[in-house]
Amino acid sequence: ARPITDIGTENISRIATGFSEFDRVLGGGIVPGSVTLIAGEPGIGKSTLLLETAGNVARLTAFATERNTVLYISGEESQAQVRMRASRIGAMEPNLLLASTTDLSTVLGLIEQFKPALAIVDSAQTIVSQDVDGISGGSTQVREVASALIDTAKTLDIPVLLVGHVTKDGSIAGPRTLEHLVDVVCQFEGDAETALRMLLSLIHI
């Protein structure tokens, strides 16, 4: 432990997402060690937004001496499917690492192995821990997944963007405590009949 007066904040360097509005919603960019939940209805474009963000951050960190990779982990699509989407949106960066798994221990192992500048997990409802009972997307599983990701993010000082689905009534699928576990909750909304999308910050710690 250290005296609070000895702890400075000047060395906290936020990571730019490559989208000025996204950065603004996040208070200037992604804070290292933070966990941000991006919530929205299925099909609204959460995965595409975060894959574009992954490509942008990978491009910006390509020449860094350390933590010069971005890790995108999908529990919903295969590596080939993610690659096709990345090619379509211009996110084909050699230091953007893709993985497809629904196993929590594998997810944590990948983050610990590569120690990326940014880790993206898509989604909280598809990752499963073998240490607890319950189906994927259930309250017990989602809480365990979120808690483990938060612990890893804080320990390794690696920011994590976590996708979360929203139910028909507009609430985030899984336990309500999920919203209070993470550092930031962003709601991704849109009009089904237009290409207009809005990103709102609901909780920002």
Regions found by a protein language model. Name each.
Residues A1-T36, T48, A58, T65-T69:
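Detector for small/aliphatic-rich hydrophobic stretches
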Residues G33, E41-I44, T48-V57, T61-A148:
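Conserved inter-motif catalytic segment of the P-loop NTP-binding fold
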Residues I120, P159-H165:
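Structural recognition of the conserved hydrophobic beta-strand(s) that form the central parallel beta-sheet
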Residues T126, D151, K168:
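Residues immediately C-terminal
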Residues Q141-L161, Q187:
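Substrate-engagement module of ASCE P-loop NTPases
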Residues V163-A173:
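Canonical AAA+ ATPase core
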Residues T177-Q187:
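A short helix-turn-beta junction within AAA+ P-loop NTPase domains corresponding to the substrate/partner-engaging
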Residues I203-I205:
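Conserved small/polar residues in nucleotide/adenosyl-binding loops
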